[in-house]
Amino acid sequence: VHVTSRILTTAFAAGLLATGVAACGSSDDSGSSTGSASSGGGSSVTATLNGAGSTFAAPIYQQVGADLKDKGLTINYQGVGSGAGVSQFAAGTVDFAGSDPALADEDKAAIKKGEAVQIPFALGAITASYNLSGVKSGLKLDGETLANIYLGKVKSWDDAAIKAQNPDVQLPSTKITVVHRSDSSGTTKGFTQFLANYSPAWKSGPGVDKDIKWPTGTGAKGNDGVAAAVKQTDGAIGYVEQAYALQNGFTFADVKNKAGKYVAPTLESTSAAADGIEVPADLGVSTIDAPGDGAYPIVSQTFAITYKDGCKAGLDKNKVTGLKTFFNYLINDGQDTIKKLSYAPIPDSLKAKDQQAVDAMQCNGAAIGS
């Protein structure tokens, strides 16, 4: 078993042993379909599904793989970052991709084997986690200050900009060590989008993307790599998905939202970011900098991506049936797993549209599991 996330809680480490997380290409060893109904919709099937992408969502894929093992599905998932995962899917080396940002037009154009379907199935807070001796969780930071930290303009923890937002906190003069992602990352795209919203210098400089030229700091691969670097360095700050922050017992900032409120990343404030969310036809939603007093402002959605008609894309029927069962589980019974792992479930309004898209998955133009 090749485990893609190095920093794991005992709670889902056991699940990993049953999941079969492995580094491998798309497999034709997909077994056989029984045609009986399975939990969350679709058909019961014996299949091996190979995926790659988001480290943000890797704990979900790992645990869901364990959940579905007794239903005949083996899910092999590589947490290589959203950009690499989408590239592998476009190249046809995996059956599905995990990505935190929605597919961009250039991503869709690169997927030559068939039209893709992207299913947003969970929300997660991107924390501004710090390792600062003597300072508890809840340090207040706004978007401009975070941008200036990552621009290298705010260099110490007792900088006036941080002091002004935290007058009652005894801040040390410790040097700030900036940690960022070194790989192509959906977490990076979400974080840089937030910074650009509050910093013209960021917007016109480093900009918004899955992989940018960083003005300062140390790069690390994956959410787990950033978490490890922050944990090892007093004075460090890094942006990591909340599940990784909680696993490591990190302290993290209350970040100022669009309504002017400093909000801690919690399940409730993450869910609030999806209140009244606009859902485009391709389901490419975004929850960064959402309105609402209670919304945490740096919330990323995560997508599972495959083909609308997998058989036409070259996958066999059993594998395509397995993908539909897997996607159905993610948006139905899997939502309980998502909550247990400290991610927020999707709202009912989005789930209904997800269900329509999953129900429309086909094999050579025919419905699956009907």
Which residues make up each language-model segment?
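Bacterial N-terminal signal peptides that target proteins for export
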Residues: 1-11
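Periplasmic-binding protein-like
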Residues: 119-130, 254-306
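Non-catalytic, conformational "gating/processing" segments within enzyme and secreted inhibitor domains
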Residues: 167-194
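N-terminal segment of the mature folded domain
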Residues: 29, 35-163, 170-171, 227-229, ...
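Extracellular/periplasmic juxtamembrane helices and adjacent flexible linkers that interface
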Residues: 2, 41-43, 169-174, 289-370
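C-terminal motif of bacterial Sec signal peptides marking the signal peptidase cleavage site
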Residues: 19-23
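Ligand-binding pocket segment of bilobal, Venus flytrap-like solute-binding proteins
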Residues: 86, 184-276
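Short helix-loop capping/hinge motifs at secondary-structure junctions, enriched
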Residues: 133-139, 156, 184-187, 201-202, ...
